[in-house]
Amino acid sequence: RYMFGWLGGIGMAFLASSVFLRETEGGEGGILAATGYGYYGIAAACLMFVGMMVSSLGTHRHIGQLHVPPVRDKIKIGQVVSEVLETMKNRSFQSLFLASIFSGTAAGMQAALSIYFATFFWGLKASELAIFPIFQAVAACCAVPIAHALGKRFDKKRAAIGSFLFMICFGPLMLFGRLADIVPENDSPVLLPLLLGHNFVEVCVIIVFSILFGAMMADVVEDSAVDTTRRSEGVIFAARGFAGKMVSGLGILLAGVILSAANLPRNAAPEDVDVQVLVDLVLYAAPGQIVLYTLAL
């Protein structure tokens, strides 16, 4: 599931930049061309269906190995609600659930704004954006042993908080560096390697945190089973997934508010956008992300 999630997302980002949204020799196409997104959506939907079927059919044989709860003759709706509420009273679950809400909002906002920063702020073309997924795939492979090593060296909570703090501080570093005239201009050949290196480290740390966070959720399942004498992993992981999906949409909404507040013009070419608009975009987005991620702690 996690493999399809990360490699599928990275692979689709590569296909988007190199196939569906690539720029033609005549100057047509590219990130800002609407026509390519329709084909991209169809291809993504088909691959998502294949991924779900492979995951479901590939794990179906393990159903017999799962914990089988005791048979109960009659289950009333009120009893189900009572058991769900009892599970959600677990303090560790409540902490991780709230962290999912704030971090999911920040992640949704960051994902929605990333294409605007890449296109308008950094002036990257589709051919350059296609390089990033390659580095992200390598980062995903590096993150697994790093997360394992951190989990063994420290307890999961300390390792997760440490990686999360690093992510908060490191994420907006390039944006603030540009405002401080430390990062090279867009026409510099040094800029793309710097952005690739920054993105590699950032994605690696994000995946490390995701792995540690998932391991902490598994510990909550065991803790809840001790308190309630019931296995409630379905409720716990469903609640976490629901929180992430629900508030990622809220993050996209906040991204739209930020774009409106910064007065980013519609249908404008990157070279036609005023510098102050881009500065405002950074000053609205970066502190907002920092606040949301900090609240997740």
Model-derived features with residue positions:
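Membrane-embedded alpha-helical bundles of multi-pass transporters/translocases
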Residues: 1-297
